[in-house]
Structure formats: structure tokens, C-alpha cells
Curated annotation (Swiss-Prot):
Component of the heterotetrameric Sec62/63complex composed of SEC62, SEC63, SEC71 and SEC72. The Sec62/63 complex associates with the Sec61 complex to form the Sec complex. The chain crosses the membrane at residues 150-169, 184-204. Present with 16500 molecules/cell in log phase SD medium. Pfam families: Sec62. GO terms for biological process: post-translational protein targeting to membrane, translocation. Residues 251-265 have a biased composition (Basic residues). Disulfide bonds: none annotated. Its main location: endoplasmic reticulum. GO terms for cellular component: endoplasmic reticulum; membrane; rough endoplasmic reticulum membrane; Sec62/Sec63 complex; translocon complex. This is Translocation protein SEC62. Residues 2-149, 205-274 are cytoplasmic. Residues 251-274 are annotated as: Disordered. The gene is SEC62.
Length: 274
């Protein structure tokens, strides 16, 4: 079993600048097949070590390595040397704190660590020792800046400057901004009016449809879903017709199908052993 400890030796060929360049290249690489997990109460990308090794064998990395071997070390064709070089690169990323070894927790383990299990994202905690095994998990602690980040900064600064210079705007622009703000307030007021009307209709309908639940119409602004999903379905009775309830049923069906599939696999494995 390979482990990274204080006594591990990384080759001199992979320095800090090289580690940063490699991390930038592979940060969002498709070979990593990254997933989202909750690490220190934040959504973070995590991946398996074997996926990182595959990314090092990708065409993108090979092209960079051919042009700049001093920054992107060449991966040897020999299997043993290949493993050593991959380990060397990854150890340097760990030492630079660009990747952090983690352990993925199951529901019961979450409760033991005082964490609330999440249906959408698995919880991750720091692993005391980085085991460079194929299925060990790691999270990124490195997020290179993208062109979109720069565009957002420029956009925010431009908006602030435009608002500060509002008194200098031409009369036509100020009149236009006035009508735009009125339109925005109108839309907001419309949403509140629909929500109030929906509530009144629901309460009144409870008298007639008490057994099945009150009658409601779209949109459900308080549903945990997107804008379009809040209009689906257009109307219904009680909780069973709501978007969240139907989504819950789908999740339960998927879990049930997965359990049955696992049972069949277990039965087949036992049959093969016998």
C-alpha cells in the first residue's frame, strides 16, 4: 500500500510552478469524472486517484508535455516508472495543498461525526493519511481564475461606476431606468399577489376538499425548485400533486430499483460460488 508521509520523496523535476501548471490543466479535466461533495460545509469537487492518473495519460497532457517537458513531466511508457512518476506529481500537488485527501462518509458515519446526511451531496472529511490507492478520494483546494471571473469583476465595477454617475446620465436614460424599475416592482408585486391569491383559494377549498387536501394553482413560489418547475403541475389537490412529492417518489423508486438490483447481484454471486 502506497502512502504519503513526512518521509516521502518527490523528485526535483516537479517543482511548485510545475505543480500549479499541472493543476490548472487538469482541474476540470473530463477524465477525472468529478462529483460534488460537502467538504467543510462547502460544495467541492472530488475525484478518485486512479482518475487523476488517467488524466495524466490524456491527449491534452501529452501535447503539453511534448511542448514543455520542463513544466509538464513526461509520463514514461514503462509501467513501474509510470506509476512512480504519477505518484511523484500527485505528491507534489498534495504538498502544495492543491489537493487534499478525504474520506467519503456514509449516512451512519455522518451522524457519528455530527453531520446531517444530505440527499444530494455526500459528506467528506479530511483523511489523516493520504493513501495513493486507486479508489482513494481527494478534493481540490485550487480554483484557477477563468475569463468568466475577470468578466464578472469588470461587469460589477462597470455597474457600480454607472450607478455612481447616475446624475450625469442623459434625461432619456434616466427616464428609461425609471420605467425599468417600475416594471421590476410590478413583476415582484405580481408574484406576491399570485401567492396571496393561491393561499386564499387553498384555505377556502379546504372546506369542500378536506379529505384530499385543498385545491391549489401554480406557481408554488415556496417550492424548492426552479422557476419553470414551480409551474408544474398547473394545479392539484393536497400534497400528492406537488412537485416536491413527485420528486420524492421518483427518488424512492430509484432507491428501490437499486436495492433490487443489488439483491439480484448478490444472489447471482452466491449461485456462482456454489
Amino acid at each position: 500500500m502506497s502512502a504519503v508521509g513526512p518521509g516521502s520523496n518527490a523528485g526535483a523535476s516537479v517543482n511548485g510552478g510545475s505543480a500549479t501548471a499541472i493543476a490548472t490543466l487538469l482541474r476540470n479535466h473530463k477524465e477525472l469524472k468529478q462529483r460534488q461533495g460537502l467538504f467543510q460545509a462547502k460544495q467541492t469537487d472530488f475525484f478518485r486517484y486512479k482518475r487523476f492518473v488517467r488524466a495524466l495519460h490524456s491527449e491534452e497532457y501529452a501535447n503539453k508535455s511534448a511542448r514543455q517537458p520542463e513544466i509538464y513531466p513526461t509520463i514514461p511508457s514503462n509501467k513501474i516508472e509510470d506509476q512512480l512518476k504519477s505518484r511523484e506529481i500527485f505528491i507534489q500537488l498534495i504538498k502544495a495543498q492543491m489537493v487534499i485527501p478525504v474520506k467519503k462518509l456514509h449516512s451512519q458515519e455522518c451522524k457519528e461525526h455530527g453531520l446531517k446526511p444530505s440527499k444530494d451531496f455526500p459528506h467528506l472529511i479530511v483523511s489523516n493519511k493520504a493513501q495513493l490507492e486507486a479508489d482513494e478520494y481527494f478534493v481540490w483546494n485550487y480554483n484557477p481564475r477563468t475569463y468568466m471571473d475577470y468578466l464578472i469583476v469588470i461587469g460589477v465595477v462597470s455597474i457600480i461606476l454607472a450607478l455612481v454617475c447616475y446624475p450625469l446620465w442623459p434625461r432619456s436614460m434616466r427616464r428609461g431606468s425609471y420605467y425599468v424599475s417600475l416594471g421590476a416592482f410590478g413583476i415582484l408585486a405580481g408574484f406576491f399577489a399570485v401567492a396571496i391569491l393561491r393561499l386564499i383559494l387553498y384555505v377556502l377549498s379546504l372546506i369542500v376538499y378536506k379529505d384530499v387536501g385543498g385545491f391549489w394553482i401554480f406557481p408554488n413560489l415556496f417550492e424548492d425548485c426552479g422557476v419553470l418547475e414551480s409551474f408544474k403541475p398547473l394545479y392539484g389537490f393536497g400534497e400528492k400533486d406537488t412537485y416536491s412529492y413527485k420528486k420524492k417518489l421518483k427518488r424512492m423508486k430509484k432507491k428501490q430499483a437499486k436495492r433490487e438490483s443489488n439483491k439480484k447481484k448478490a444472489i447471482n454471486e452466491k449461485a456462482e460460488q456454489n
